Regions:
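Conserved hydrophobic beta-strands of the Rossmann-like cofactor-binding core
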Residues: 62-66
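C-terminal helical subdomain
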Residues: 164, 182-236
Length: 236
């Protein structure tokens, strides 16, 4: 479990730490291991996977979930149109996004190829052939979808699959802080996308979905899982 702040130092003034996240994994029956890593820094990423190789010798599942476009340090958006928005928003979305995904995946794949098995899940926020109201965001998300398609082509011979997974409006800490909760009927818990990841990772035929951008809601129908409260949202 990587990517959040550690030992009380904060990322974007958020109080949550990677130790807390790892503890949550352990509490749910897994084994959470907190590792500090800046996924936009190639040295950090290389060091992370060197440690994984030394300790485990392989990696079976990689979930890329990084997005830098919401940081409070970014300038306030000047308007809705791309020429009214700061280029810093574009840089943040692409660097802490598609760039970080590629850096991480290119270090993970060599640990998947020897056993001829692996799954890369790239978290995205929109499906192919949809248009966002924000050009920078649209390009950032479609870059993730496109890289997933090309990954499928290059990884197929090694039996490694790549899927772009699109959750709905998740009830993250930011969303909860903004006043949204279960009563709104539109948000979903982070466990919902987690269950989608588990469904994909345990599907012996996941290669049939490789290269696609798929909504969590579609997978909920296919695999028959629900959110923790028993609901099953079907629209993004």
């Amino acid at each position: 479990m990587t990517g959040r702040s550690i030992h009380g130092s904060t990322t974007d003034n958020r109080p949550e730490t990677i130790e807390e996240t790892a503890a949550g994994v352990t509490a749910r029956g897994g084994k959470g291991i907190a590792v500090r890593c800046d996924h936009t820094d190639s040295t950090d990423v290389c060091r992370l996977f060197e440690g994984i190789k030394d300790q485990h010798g392989r990696i079976d599942l990689l979930v890329n979930s990084v997005f830098g476009g919401s940081e409070s340090s970014l300038p306030r958006a000047g308007g809705r149109r791309f020429w009214e928005r700061s280029e810093e928003h574009w840089d943040a979305m692409m660097v802490a996004g598609a760039h970080a995904y590629v850096l991480t995946a290119r270090n993970a794949v060599p640990l998947m190829i020897p056993q001829q098995k692996g799954l890369i899940i790239n978290i995205t926020a929109q499906l192919d052939n949809t248009i966002s109201a924000n050009l920078y965001y649209d390009l950032a998300m479609n870059a993730v979808n496109r890289m997933t398609l090309v990954m499928e082509k290059e990884l197929k011979e090694y039996n490694v699959s790549a899927v772009a997974l699109c959750p709905g409006w998740m009830r993250t800490e930011r969303v909860v802080d903004a006043g949204f909760g279960p009563e709104d009927g539109a948000t979903e818990t982070t466990a919902y996308v987690g269950r989608a990841v588990v469904a994909l990772a345990t599907d012996a035929h996941v290669a049939s979905l490789s290269g696609r951008a798929i909504e969590v809601a579609e997978l909920a129908r296919t695999y028959g899982f629900t959110d923790v409260d028993g609901t099953r949202l079907f629209t993004h």
